[in-house]
Amino acid sequence: MWGLVQDGSITKIINKPRGMVIGDVRYSRKIFELWSKAELEAKGIYEVVFDNSNKKDEQWYINTNQSFAFAGGKITASNGSATPKKHADTLWTSQDKTDGKIPDGKDVGDVAVEGLKTKLIRTVKQQAAGILQDTDWYITRKADAGTAVPSSITTHRAAVRTKAAEQETAITNAADTPALETLYTYVNTAEEGDPPVMERPLGELPRLES
């Protein structure tokens, strides 16, 4: 990506090589392949440098659009401050009702927009159900034929439910969006010099050993 600078201001952002007119002269797209950095800059064409220091994980934050600035002989593309996504549900209010914004079937206090916590807890429930589904046949067989469920399976299923409940509690108790992000962020918990062990505070749902 490049930018065209004229009289000290960026007048055009060039996303890919293309022909262009600068002043009264038309230049081929080939200049982006054949000309040196200095030759391009002599015509006011500068390669864009990306500053991602303000850009955050879009699972947790809403990033701003990039803005472009020319200073010190270079064009920099950067983001403004990211906004954390709402961790709690947004509810319909009395004012919403007065303004006629609440849809049919909903009322004051109902969820208008789900927050991250609701979505994450739903995912935990789905993941736990998916793991338990692998051993559901033991339960079906017991109901149909009276065959006892192995104790290892019973223990595993209980462990899945227990861990899922712990995860849901941790999510519920998170104070804000950065706290939720921390729960899901993997860090190396190994001692220095040992092979890396990547773990997250939220932990993992148990898997049945083969």
Label for each model-derived stretch:
Residues 1-133, 165-210:
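Interaction-interface detector
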Residues 117, 145-149:
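Residue-level recognition of alpha-helical structural elements
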Residues 135-146, 167:
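Secondary-structure edge/capping motif, primarily at the C-terminal ends of alpha-helices
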Residues 150-158, 181:
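Short, charged, amphipathic alpha-helical segments
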